[in-house]
């Protein structure tokens, strides 16, 4: 094993000793020796199966057969979640064949960040993770269930569902993906059209046609953003079946994998032969494997918050130092858009998860001795699923990458440093997705141009006010200020400035997700401006140094001068009402800092 990996793992274990012990005691107390519904009074139970078919009622009355909860995030708004419409039918059929019963225990909201990007609704995006966790918990709280299947793919949905699953950590749980849409317009062409539109060289209809050719069918968007990073990370964590993340929707193999996940969760219950509750399965080693997956693939920066919150739900304490120290030894081994031109379908064709797991296990950069939904040992995830005469089977995946432009070997990685860098200095701590930023653009020292809203940046760009070397500061975008929206609308104009050979960087307490692109961006700055961060004292013209190689984020202003300045606190009332934002005020005020997971839930 890599010594650094062991050091980080051991310090997480030590740091989490008390909280993890308390968590395990809690789930042990919740465990029962029989099916969970046996604890209900007759009236409770009758309500619970009132709408079931007669055969299912008989099974539930018997107290012998498993009842599996289905927590679904189906809606028609998310292309990745639309396929879930028919999953309950597939699941119930597979459960009946396994002498078990399934009920849709609840649905959770699922927001498409692609739809809300740059809109008021984006200010609910991060908060929706907490609502998803609580909504799933409401469904499971009926206490009718012996295991659960979680149907979710996209940005906040998988982290929220994981937090809920771990709150019911005494139950086994399997996550069931839907898979990516087929590849559409090449990513390089999509970016070209966006930048032309930002420069006023193509009209809105040309932009719309380009976007519609990129996002065109049911399934996950194919770029390597938060949704596909979710799938990568949870497969490395053993939370869904080997090789199941990136199989297309509406294919015989996808349906076979859904049925197999269903059968597997019945084996993992107290009535089965492989009892493995999710709260015991997800331990410190599993969390480290998830971080390694993120770093090795240059995944979404959102996971520097999501993984923290997910781990806390299991009583495990991680921080950005853990990400940083692992990033020093985990190489970047995948090049997917925005880190390169390839999409997630190219990744799958190049060998996918099995190749990466095999390479990282050989390098001693993953813990093999972990429990997964497929059984003990992460080496199971070097297998790939296939249909053998119409029946699902697993075989060894590719021994090495089938396309070295998409998946590199450990010996010849795209970079010897993981795709995420933690920055620190007097401005606080921040995260930079270095995997998408050319080395020559990772270091900048330039005057600040300060904005209080992302919507003010485009007019400044159009007026030529940014045609110079500068550090664009967009502040009061943190969790407590306005819910920490993603700021993707900034990328096309800032990308144009880079192409004009200006030295440009972005510094913000907001988010950018996995599609942060080529602009060097110090994001998730914590403490945020609204909550006492020095970012609130930055003025136009102040020199800021951003160094993605050494991990520096420094405001080069004399300490005495900074002490004399008053923080600038703008009127944020416009972010408090409209589009339902007033309903989230209590949650927003309780959100922790980005490094603490940006969560309002106390675990």
Mark where each language-model region is.
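Catalytic or ion-coupling anion/metal-binding cores of large enzyme and transporter domains
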Residues: 1-66, 72-76, 80, 89-108, ...
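Acidic/charged coordination and interface sites in well-structured regions
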Residues: 86
């Amino acid at each position: 094993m890599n010594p650094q990996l062991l050091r980080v793992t051991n310090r997480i274990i030590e740091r989490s000793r008390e909280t993890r012990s308390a968590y395990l005691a809690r789930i042990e107390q919740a465990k029962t020796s029989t099916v969970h519904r046996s604890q209900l009074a007759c009236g409770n139970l009758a309500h619970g199966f009132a709408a079931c078919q007669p055969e299912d009622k008989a099974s539930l009355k018997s107290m012998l057969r498993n009842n599996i909860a289905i927590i679904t995030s189906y809606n028609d708004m998310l292309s990745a979640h639309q396929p879930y419409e028919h999953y309950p039918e597939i699941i119930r059929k597979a459960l009946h064949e396994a002498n078990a019963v399934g009920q849709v225990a609840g649905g959770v909201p699922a927001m498409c960040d692609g739809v809300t990007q740059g809109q008021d609704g984006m200010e609910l995006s991060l908060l929706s993770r907490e609502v998803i966790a609580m909504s799933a918990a409401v469904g499971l709280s009926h206490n009718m269930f012996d295991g659960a299947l979680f149907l979710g793919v996209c940005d906040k949905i998988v982290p929220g569902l994981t937090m809920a699953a771990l709150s019911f950590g005494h139950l086994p749980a399997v996550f069931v993906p839907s898979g990516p849409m087929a590849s559409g317009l090449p990513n390089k062409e999509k970016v070209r059209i966006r930048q032309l539109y930002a420069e006023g060289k193509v009209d809105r209809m040309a932009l719309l046609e380009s976007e519609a050719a990129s996002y065109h069918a049911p399934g996950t968007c194919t770029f390597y953003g938060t949704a596909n990073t979710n799938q990568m990370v949870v497969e490395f964590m053993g939370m869904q079946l080997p090789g199941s993340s990136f199989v297309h929707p509406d294919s015989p193999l996808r349906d076979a994998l859904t049925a197999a996940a269903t059968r597997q969760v019945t084996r993992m219950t107290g009535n089965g032969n492989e009892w493995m509750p999710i709260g015991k399965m997800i331990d410190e080693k599993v969390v480290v494997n998830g971080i390694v997956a993120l770093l090795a693939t240059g995944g979404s920066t959102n996971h520097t918050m999501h993984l923290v919150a997910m781990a806390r739900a299991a009583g495990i304490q991680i921080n950005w130092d853990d990400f940083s120290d692992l990033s020093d030894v985990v190489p970047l081994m995948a090049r997917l858009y925005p880190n390169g031109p390839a999409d997630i379908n190219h990744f799958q064709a190049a060998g996918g998860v099995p190749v990466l797991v095999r390479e990282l296990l050989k390098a001693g950069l993953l813990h093999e001795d972990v429990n997964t939904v497929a059984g003990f040992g992460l080496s199971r995830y070097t297998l790939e699923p296939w249909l053998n005469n119409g029946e699902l089977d697993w075989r060894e995946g590719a021994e090495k990458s089938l396309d070295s432009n998409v998946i590199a070997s450990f010996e010849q990685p795209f970079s010897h440093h993981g795709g995420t860098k933690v920055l620190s200095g007097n401005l606080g701590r921040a995260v930079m997705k270095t995997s998408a930023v050319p080395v020559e653009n990772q270091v900048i020292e330039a005057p600040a141009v300060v904005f209080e809203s992302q919507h003010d940046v485009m007019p400044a760009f159009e007026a030529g006010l940014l045609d110079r070397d500068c550090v664009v500061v967009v502040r009061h975008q943190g969790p407590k200020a306005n819910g920490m929206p993603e700021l993707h609308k900034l990328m096309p104009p800032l990308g144009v400035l880079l192409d004009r050979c200006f030295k440009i960087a972005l510094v913000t307490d907001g988010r950018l997700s996995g599609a942060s692109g080529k602009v060097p961006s110090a994001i998730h700055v914590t403490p945020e401006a609204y909550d006492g961060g020095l970012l609130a004292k930055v003025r136009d013209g102040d020199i800021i140094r951003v160094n993605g190689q050494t991990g520096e984020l420094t405001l080069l202003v004399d300490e005495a001068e900074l002490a004399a300045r008053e923080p600038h606190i703008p009127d944020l009332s416009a972010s408090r009402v409209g589009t339902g934002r007033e309903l989230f005020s209590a949650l927003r005020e309780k959100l922790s800092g980005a490094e603490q997971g940006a969560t309002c839930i106390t675990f």
